[in-house]
């Protein structure tokens, strides 16, 4: 009998406490970048019952009403009812933002490559905001070149949010989680969905029977293609039996605690750095986007069925210290050729990435829920396939 394997990924809704924090951090970043594209921002957020704390380091001359940004973001998510224990108009907002360390700023503003060098390349000016390693990934399992488990998990919670905001399911509240287990065949191809777990916050009047039927009919069967569902598929919907208390009233939330949800659902490696609240000089964010950009174009070019790109940096240095590409035996050319081509085609210095992907714009709030990678509902520059021809030509 052929060997089959299971792989599981999860996602969370925009009303999950950690995602509320991510969205507030990125909303603050966007508000600052809209007025000062050169700003350096590292905004962290903590949320819990009735309270929001915003803290971190910022270098900018722009004025932003942090209190208003926080309240508007919470309202957009759907926390507008005091019964939820966390409401846009009544929550306490406590900002504590200070200027970026001058020791860090000197390495970011003047990279090692240009110090004392009169013949400067402008793209060498910005050094990496920290040391670290970042990964990008792509696989041909879905149209968006993402692993199927995380792609489906995101779509399930996005569908819940659509039904809640449209009023089609009136008893839904903002907090929700999804988890999808996919069965793979001996060729590592997805063949069926084995298990779906959905926990969704609800009004106290809603019955378990009503929630169960609505989630199956209006969420699971609307999102997951019927070809992946059979009579053996298992559905666990609100398996605790009750989910009325949720959001920050049920759990505290913090920026950067959903890094696997933000990326590939555990299917690929992760360097450990979070994204939200950070401007593009922070390579945790910008280099992760660049790595996804490389990986996606490699797979779209037919040079591999699966590709993982690792980039690594030293603080205050512009050029990456390493570029590594792994195609897991699916490549049509040598990995060394792909690495050479990536260095030729993609400028991987922080300033090069910022220019290549136009990252000084206020585009980040939209990425802070439902994944930073593989998005088909919004136009993100690192999801474009405009380097396919160049890669094909480079490896001839």
Swiss-Prot record:
A Pfam family it matches: S-AdoMet_synt_N
Gene Ontology MF annotations: ATP binding; magnesium ion binding; methionine adenosyltransferase activity
Keywords, alphabetical: ATP-binding, Cytoplasm, Magnesium, Metal-binding, Nucleotide-binding, One-carbon metabolism, Potassium, Transferase
Record carries keyword Protease: no
GO biological process: one-carbon metabolic process; S-adenosylmethionine biosynthetic process
Free-text remark on how the cofactor is bound: Binds 2 divalent ions per subunit. Binds 1 potassium ion per subunit.
Main location: cytoplasm
Binding site for ATP: 16, 175-177, 242-243, 251, 257-258, 274, 278
Residues binding K(+): 44
Cell location: Cytoplasm
Amino-acid positions noted as binding Mg(2+) in the UniProt annotation, renumbered to this chain: 18
Superkingdom of source: Bacteria
InterPro entries: ADOMET_SYNTHASE_CS, S-AdoMet_synt_C, S-AdoMet_synt_central, S-AdoMet_synt_N, S-AdoMet_synthetase, S-AdoMet_synthetase_sfam
Signal peptide per UniProt: none
The reaction(s) this protein catalyses: L-methionine + ATP + H2O = S-adenosyl-L-methionine + phosphate + diphosphate
Cofactor(s) for this UniProt protein: Mg(2+); K(+)
Chain segments carrying region Flexible loop: 100-110
Residues annotated to bind L-methionine: 57, 100, 251, 282
Gene Ontology CC terms, in alphabetical order: cytoplasm
Catalytic activity, EC: 2.5.1.6
Listed pathway(s): Amino-acid biosynthesis; S-adenosyl-L-methionine biosynthesis; S-adenosyl-L-methionine from L-methionine: step 1/1
Job of this protein: Catalyzes the formation of S-adenosylmethionine (AdoMet) from methionine and ATP. The overall synthetic reaction is composed of two sequential steps, AdoMet formation and the subsequent tripolyphosphate hydrolysis which occurs prior to release of AdoMet from the enzyme.
Subunit structure: Homotetramer; dimer of dimers.
Family indicated by similarity: Belongs to the AdoMet synthase family.
Protein name, as recorded: S-adenosylmethionine synthase
Protein's organism: Streptococcus pneumoniae (strain P1031)
Gene this protein is translated from: metK
């Amino acid at each position: 009998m052929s060997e089959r394997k299971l792989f599981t990924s999860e996602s969370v809704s925009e009303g999950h406490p950690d995602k509320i924090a991510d969205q507030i951090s990125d909303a603050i970043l966007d508000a600052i970048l809209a007025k000062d594209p050169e700003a350096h921002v590292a905004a962290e957020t903590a949320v819990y019952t009735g309270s929001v704390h915003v803290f971190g380091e910022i270098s900018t001359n722009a004025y932003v009403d942090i209190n208003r940004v926080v309240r508007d973001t919470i309202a957009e998510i759907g926390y507008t009812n005091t019964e939820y224990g966390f409401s846009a108009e009544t929550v306490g907002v406590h900002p504590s933002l200070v200027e970026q360390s001058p020791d860090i700023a000197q390495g970011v503003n003047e990279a090692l490559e240009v110090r004392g060098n009169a013949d400067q390349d402008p793209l060498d000016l910005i050094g990496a905001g920290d040391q670290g390693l970042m990964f990008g990934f792509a696989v041909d399992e879905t149209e968006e070149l993402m692993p199927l488990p995380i792609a489906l998990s995101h779509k399930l919670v996005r569908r819940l949010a659509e039904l809640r905001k449209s009023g089609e399911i009136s008893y839904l509240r903002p907090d929700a989680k999804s988890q999808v287990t996919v069965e793979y065949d001996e060729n590592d191809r997805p063949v069926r969905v084995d298990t779906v777990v959905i926990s969704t916050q609800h009004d106290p009047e809603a019955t378990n029977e009503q929630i169960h039927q609505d989630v199956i009919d209006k969420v699971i069967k609307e999102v997951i293609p019927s070809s992946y569902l059979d009579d053996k598929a298992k559905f666990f919907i609100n398996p605790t039996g009750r989910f009325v208390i949720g959001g920050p009233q049920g759990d505290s939330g913090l920026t950067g605690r959903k890094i696997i949800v933000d990326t590939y659902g555990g299917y690929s490696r992760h360097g450990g750095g979070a994204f939200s609240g950070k401007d593009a000089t922070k390579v945790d964010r910008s280099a992760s986007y660049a790595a996804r950009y490389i990986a996606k174009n490699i797979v779209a070019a037919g040079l591999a069925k699966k590709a993982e790109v690792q980039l690594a940096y030293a603080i205050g240095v512009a050029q990456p210290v390493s570029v590594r590409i792994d195609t897991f035996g699916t490549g049509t050319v040598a990995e060394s050729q792909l690495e050479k081509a990536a260095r030729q085609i993609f400028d991987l210095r922080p300033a090069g990435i910022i220019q290549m992907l136009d990252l000084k714009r206020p585009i980040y709030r939209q990425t802070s829920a439902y994944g930073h990678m593989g998005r088909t509902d919004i136009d993100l520059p690192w999801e474009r396939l405009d380097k396919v021809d160049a890669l094909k030509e480079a490896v001839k």
